């Protein structure tokens, strides 16, 4: 029996939630935010912090970094105690800072595509060039072409790895990560591994932290991680930057300070520590999301067979092929909006043949959303 209730949810309409900046009759399955109540330990920790009644400047506490150490040991049997760590406001502020610190204007920065749209933004906003490495799509699955990776690394200064991958949900194998690390060392490429979605895998044995894959990874890699995605605390800005490369971390610390993104807020450490100690909640939310994915797959097969759901065992994001509809994603999401459903166009991630749907919602909400998706398809 479940300890936690994922069928109930707060009413976010009319408030300042980014995902719910929609009309009251619209269902948003777009922005990567959960609709669930947070783990009880998180709420308790925040209330305890709030009750202090004085909210001055704070610094990242040592027990925060200890909590990360314990989390990695419990989840992956990976010891990061000797890794050097830094606090940051978030994965994207960290990424922007690292781009500035480890590359120069108009350098090439490579990443797998389709890609999280903010990767494109951070690269372009810092006056760098994007080198796209397309993932291979076949039979509703993705795979890597490591020859393309090597060609990209010959020209790249930085490689941004999203592991597991957003938006496709692809989980990189240990062997693939080893090859990436060794190619990066061969060509002098820094690997920035964004692992924010890593808690969102039902079978944690499928995930290999990049720096645990091989000794070369520890030499060439910096990891960006945060509990914000896995435990639904994105509004409380907190993240971790860590590496075993001391020279890299010297530049990281300088850059985070230069860009003013290394300051902790009053609630961030408490929320993060409580989240990292809520593995029971994480296990149950992954089970719930997995069941939602199975429901989505069955619904599409039964009622919207023109759509194809990409096979995935990670994240709470569904990547759906709409190429049989004879329309592109930008036009299709407009039709969905007319039917009261808000979803994300694949064009912003680099592939207009797909849409992305958020599954981290109560099943009742997902069911209503899928009914509207069906209506949108039937209206074409």
Spans of model-derived segments:
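N-terminal small-domain helix-loop-helix segment of the aminotransferase-like
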Residues: 2-90, 97, 379-380
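Conserved core segment of the aminotransferase class I/II
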Residues: 44-48, 215, 219-290
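Conserved core of the PLP fold type I
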Residues: 55-182, 198-200, 207-212
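Helix C-cap/helix->beta junction micro-motif
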Residues: 126, 186-187, 217, 339, ...
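Conserved glycine-rich beta-strand-loop-beta hairpin in the small C-terminal domain of fold type I
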Residues: 269, 273, 289-297, 309-322, ...
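PLP-dependent enzyme catalytic core of the Aspartate aminotransferase-like
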Residues: 326-328, 334-344, 348-380
């Amino acid at each position: 029996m479940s300890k936690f209730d994922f069928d109930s949810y707060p009413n976010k309409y009319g408030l300042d939630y980014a995902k719910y900046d929609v009309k009251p009759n619209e269902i948003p399955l777009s922005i990567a935010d959960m609709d669930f109540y947070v783990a009880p330990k998180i709420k308790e920790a925040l209330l305890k912090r709030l009750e202090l009644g004085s909210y001055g400047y704070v610094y990242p506490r040592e027990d925060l970094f200890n909590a990360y150490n314990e989390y990695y040991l419990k989840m992956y049997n990976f010891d990061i105690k000797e890794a050097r760590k830094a606090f940051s406001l978030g994965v994207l502020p960290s990424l922007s800072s690292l781009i500035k610190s480890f590359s120069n204007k108009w350098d090439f920065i490579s990443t797998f595509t389709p890609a999280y749209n903010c990767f494109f933004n951070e690269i372009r906003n810092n006056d760098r060039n994007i080198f796209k490495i397309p993932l291979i799509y076949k039979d509703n699955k993705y795979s890597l072409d490591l020859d393309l990776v090597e060609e990209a690394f010959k020209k790249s200064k930085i490689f941004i790895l999203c592991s597991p991958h957003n938006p496709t949900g692809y989980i990189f194998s240990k062997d693939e990560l080893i090859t990436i690390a060794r190619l990066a060392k061969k060509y002098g490429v820094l690997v920035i591994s964004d692992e924010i979605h890593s808690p969102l895998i039902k079978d944690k044995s499928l995930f290999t932290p990049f720096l645990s894959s091989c000794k070369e990874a520890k030499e060439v890699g910096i990891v960006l991680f945060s509990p914000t995605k896995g435990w639904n605390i994105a509004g409380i800005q907190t993240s971790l930057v860590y590496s075993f490369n001391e020279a890299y971390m010297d530049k990281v610390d300088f850059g985070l300070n230069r860009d003013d993104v290394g300051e902790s807020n009053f609630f961030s450490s408490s929320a993060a520590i409580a989240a990292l100690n809520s593995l029971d909640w994480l296990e149950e939310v992954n089970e719930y999301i997995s069941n939602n994915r199975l429901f989505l797959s069955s619904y599409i097969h039964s009622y919207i067979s023109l759509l194809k759901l990409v096979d995935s065992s990670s994240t709470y994001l569904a990547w759906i092929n709409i190429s049989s509809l004879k329309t592109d994603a930008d036009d299709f999401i407009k039709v969905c909006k007319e039917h009261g459903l808000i979803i994300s166009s694949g064009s912003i991630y680099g592939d207009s043949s797909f849409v992305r749907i958020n599954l981290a919602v109560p099943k009742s909400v997902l069911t209503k959303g899928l009914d509207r998706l069906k209506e949108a398809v039937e209206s074409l």
